[in-house]
Amino acid sequence: DPLTGLFNRWQMYKRLETCISRYTQHKLQTLTVAMGDIDFFKHVNDTYGHDAGDEVLRTLSRLFRTIMDKKGYVCRWGGEEFLFLFPDMDMDEVQLLMSDLLDDIRHTPVLYERKLIHVTMTFGVEEFGRNHTMESVIQEADRKLYLGKESGRNRVIY
């Protein structure tokens, strides 16, 4: 993705395809997907302008790259949505990482034109299982993301 430096959607599809293949061949024990969305991002753009919104996306992307280093993959799925992929990470590890990620996002203000912009994110997490397809695991993570939005935002739904 040119703005964030993260994988784009197409690159992540390829990565996910490879991981699913490894999972079905029993080369991976677990495979978990998380869909995340910046809460009230439209408000950031409307209040501070689209350049500020771009800076929020870049700042969070740098944070994601640091956190995800050697743990998994992250891409900008579109707009203010991000998809995370955790191969061979058990659910306890995923929950700990997601909890840390929520805290880090909350405590990483974005400096734009001498103003600090604070954002939060909501996530939906789904573990890949034998009855999933690539599309269905993403759809289920996305469905859980929207449950999190409906139940107050700034949270992770498993």
Task: Give, region by region, the residue ranges found by the protein language model.
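Conserved nucleotide-binding and Mg2+-coordinating catalytic segments in signaling enzymes
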Residues: 1-14, 36-50, 58
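Active-site-proximal alpha-helical element of nucleotidyl cyclase-like catalytic domains
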Residues: 18, 52-73, 81, 100, ...
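A short pre-motif secondary-structure segment
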Residues: 73-76, 117
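Catalytic-core segments of nucleotide cyclases and related cyclic-nucleotide turnover enzymes
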Residues: 46, 91-95, 99, 113, ...
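Short catalytic/binding micro-motifs of nucleotide second-messenger systems
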Residues: 22, 66-71, 103-115, 145-147
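Short regulatory alpha-helical coupling segments
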Residues: 9-29, 61-69, 87
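Active-site-flanking beta-strand signature of metal-NTP-handling nucleotidyl enzymes
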Residues: 32-37, 74
